[in-house]
A protein has these predicted regions:
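RNA-interacting cores
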Residues: 1-187
Length: 187
């Protein structure tokens, strides 16, 4: 049963990486025909399901329109390195969206690292991720995202525009929590 008041966190994160491409208006112009899709999750069984699903689709052409089709050529699993410190420099492969939902008006606002209340909302998102995915983490949830070489951007998706954070940051917090976020994503 759908409950609009219950925000659901996903147990994975992903990024689509286009090499040598640029955005021109509403189109992505490719100068290289290769792209990478990177998945990560703290749910090993989900990763295995995804991996096996993609194996079945290897060398199958998926056509999106008359000018664009893709074909999965290579698929491999890369072990994630364990974070050994309470602070790590990270670079986002895709924009960070931190959603602040107002239940009374049922409206969303997307915060960037420059907005007041960003740190609190980011920690609320992390808390929801931990709770909704039944992750055994019993310490106080507290992370800090400090901009290093960061910027904000407007991200278009399905006719909507979102405020997002991009670039490099220092992420600090408990080591166990940082490793959970390394696998499952942030935001």
């Amino acid at each position: 049963q759908y409950n609009k008041d219950l925000t659901k966190s996903k147990s994975f994160t992903f990024a689509v990486v286009f090499k040598d491409s640029k955005i021109s208006g509403d189109e992505i112009v490719f100068n290289d025909e290769h792209l990478s899709v990177i998945f990560s999750s703290f749910d090993t069984s989900l990763l295995l399901y995804l991996y096996n699903s993609f194996i079945k689709k290897r060398n199958v052409t998926k056509r999106f329109n008359k000018n664009f089709a893709i074909q999965l050529k290579r698929l491999y699993m890369v072990p994630l390195k364990t974070i050994e410190a309470d602070s790590v420099t990270i670079k986002f492969l895709s924009p960070l969206l931190v959603r602040q939902h107002d239940r009374e008006t049922n409206k969303d606002r997307y915060l960037t690292f420059r907005d007041p209340g960003f740190d609190e909302q980011l920690n609320m998102c992390v808390k929801n991720l931990i709770e909704q995915n039944n992750i055994d983490y019993r310490k106080e949830i507290s992370v800090k995202l400090i901009p290093v070489n960061a910027k904000t951007a407007l991200v278009k998706n399905m006719g909507l525009i979102f405020n997002a954070s991009l670039g490099e940051y220092t992420l600090s917090g408990d080591r166990q929590l940082l490793n959970i976020l390394h696998k499952g994503g942030l935001g």
